[in-house]
């Protein structure tokens, strides 16, 4: 496990939950995750769930993704998706408004791995270097991803070579995020 990334993720999650508490006097609320089982759910309303992060349960690796492509993934991406279960969190990085993706449950973790495999299949077909997404942006063709070769975090336009380095590492990227409610 990449402890720097794990700590940076936990720290951002704490900042996010603290900001939510300060503004709403509750744990984060999600309508999108209503009806989706998770150990994070602490209460339910008629159309939303209140959640709090929980420790990740299960194998702490993305072995299915590695096996599918016979590659070794950056330790930071393994840590990012296996440190905790949590809801997706909105954030600001410099001028970028984003949604930081998280795994919500063990079932969601399997879905995330399938989506990462699909992303890598497309990149391989287009002869692009491998990246693994960690956040979405307002423009659905752009994502924030981790370059599996360099470990840098970049903004990329899906299906193209357009990439802009945002941070030298995932830990540094997470440290610079500001919660957005």
Curated annotation (Swiss-Prot):
InterPro entries assigned: Syd, Syd_sf
Keyword Cell inner membrane: yes
Keyword Cell membrane: yes
Keyword terms: Cell inner membrane, Cell membrane, Membrane
Domain of life (superkingdom): Bacteria
Gene3D superfamilies: Syd protein (3.40.1580.20)
Location in the cell: Cell inner membrane
Its membrane topology: Peripheral membrane protein
Example of a GO cellular component annotation carried by this entry: cytoplasmic side of plasma membrane
Cited Pfam families: Syd
Predominant location: membrane
HAMAP family the UniProt entry points to: Syd
Family: Belongs to the Syd family.
Described purpose of this protein according to its UniProt entry: Interacts with the SecY protein in vivo. May bind preferentially to an uncomplexed state of SecY, thus functioning either as a chelating agent for excess SecY in the cell or as a regulatory factor that negatively controls the translocase function.
Name of this protein: Protein Syd
Source organism: Escherichia fergusonii (strain ATCC 35469 / DSM 13698 / CCUG 18766 / IAM 14443 / JCM 21226 / LMG 7866 / NBRC 102419 / NCTC 12128 / CDC 0568-73)
Gene for this chain: syd
């Amino acid at each position: 496990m990449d402890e720097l990334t794990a700590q940076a993720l936990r720290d951002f999650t704490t900042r996010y939950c603290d900001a939510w508490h300060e503004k709403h006097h509750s744990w984060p609320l999600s309508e999108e995750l209503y009806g989706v089982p998770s150990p994070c759910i602490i209460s339910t309303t008629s159309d939303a769930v209140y959640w709090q992060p929980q420790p990740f349960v299960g194998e702490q690796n993305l072995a299915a993704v590695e096996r599918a492509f016979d590659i070794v993934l950056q330790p930071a991406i393994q840590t990012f998706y296996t440190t905790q279960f949590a809801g997706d969190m909105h954030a600001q990085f410099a001028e970028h408004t984003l949604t930081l993706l998280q795994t919500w449950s063990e079932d969601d973790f399997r879905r995330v791995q399938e989506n990462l495999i699909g992303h890598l299949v497309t990149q391989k077909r287009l002869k692009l270097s491998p990246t693994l997404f960690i956040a979405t942006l307002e423009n659905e063709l752009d994502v924030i991803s981790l370059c599996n070769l360099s470990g840098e975090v970049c903004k990329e336009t899906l299906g193209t070579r357009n990439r802009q380095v945002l941070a030298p590492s995932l830990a540094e990227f997470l440290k610079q995020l500001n919660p957005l409610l």
